[in-house]
Amino acid sequence: MTKLRDLLSFLAVICATFAPITSLGDVPVLQLDRAEFVMDDGELPPPDSAAWKPQSLPDNWNVSRPQASGFGWYQIRFVLAQQPMQLYAVYAPKISISAAFYLNGQYLGSGGAFTPPATIARNANRPQFFVATPQLLRSGGNTLHVRIWSAAGVGGIAAVQIGPEAELRPLYEHRYLLQVQFQQISAALIGFVAVLMLFLWTRRPQDTMHGYLGGSCLAALVHVALFVVRDAPLPGLWWDVLCLTALGFSVAFYALFVLRFTGRRRRSFEALLWLYMAMNPFVVALVGLKQYGLIIAFESLVFFVLFVFCMGILAQFWWRRRTVESFLVFSVLVFDLILGGHDFGIFAGTVPFESMFWTPYASALGSIFIGGMLVNRFVSNLNDYEKLNVELEGRVVQKHAELEEN
């Protein structure tokens, strides 16, 4: 009974952590979901005479302007009954890829490096929060300008909130915890499992399952870096190309793991997987710098095709064996497929743009469960081997004693 109570308490804490929180203050927080938009390369907010067009928020560029890339400006007007006396803040739960904010013509801040394509901060997975002093606001009409830069197919901005800093900061910190810090922890867990599996493989090279799972986790770690690394170590969009290519590597290595786990040998299919991994970086590099969204669509297609293939093999294997291990691997695959579909839906516009990406969590949970299963199998085999050695030594001693008696 105590264990059940502890489990329910733990689940309650998890649900409370992931549940959205809302402002409860006396001063209302404004939800700004109406804007005007114009593509413009200027470094300062365009004048009112620019070719502004009405735009509702959230705005997913892959839906509203799928081929657009470069700089765009949002002009968001709002009204305050009076000039505030306390600190205010501007909070954007999600922007892509990076943005700078101007309030009534004054620069508020940006998410980091903003000189594309050479250097650009990756903020597609980071909420934006900027404090505004009362002097920047006025009674009556106010204007917030947001300058966005994005590659084709991945730009966008969620509805923006403005209100007292004390009211908006908890919303920002809650989102930052889930969207950045927890995903950084997930990346660390994936890296740990990758190192552990590759270490076991070096100790027993004949157990290629460990090597393939380690390779899958290592590639998944590189892919998850796209979500958690803001300042890319490579110039331009080459960092994005590397991280997106890693998704294909991760799934291909996982398919090889599934074949070894189920005892299947399909040499022609395995050869295709190795050919795909050899050619994928070159294909992505050729088109990735201009068609970012196309790369996401291509890698997602490979992801779904290989996962469905693996699900078919695992379903047959589980139906024949009915083991806990086979059910666990199959369940992890289904879980990853669902969360991967959710994240692809964000790009496709079928899932709300402001939704968080769940792929890092899927990769972490899958790595932990399957990695733990293989470690348990490795330890069990080691224990059986040691037990067999003890039994053999006992038999040798017994036979030696019998020979001495004779």
Where are these regions (language model features)?
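Bacterial N-terminal signal peptides
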Residues: 9-19
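Accessory carbohydrate-binding/adhesion or oligomerization-edge regions at the termini
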Residues: 21-67, 77-79, 143-174, 195
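Aromatic-lined ligand-binding clefts that engage carbohydrates, nucleic acids, or primary amines
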Residues: 52, 80-104, 144-146
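Extracellular and analogous surface-interaction loops
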Residues: 74-86, 132-138
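Beta-strand-rich ligand-recognition modules
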Residues: 103-143, 147-160
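First transmembrane helix
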Residues: 174-204, 297-318
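Interfacial "cap-and-anchor" motif at the non-cytosolic start of specific transmembrane alpha-helices
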Residues: 221-391
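Signal-transducing coiled-coil linker helix
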Residues: 384, 388-391, 395, 399-402, ...
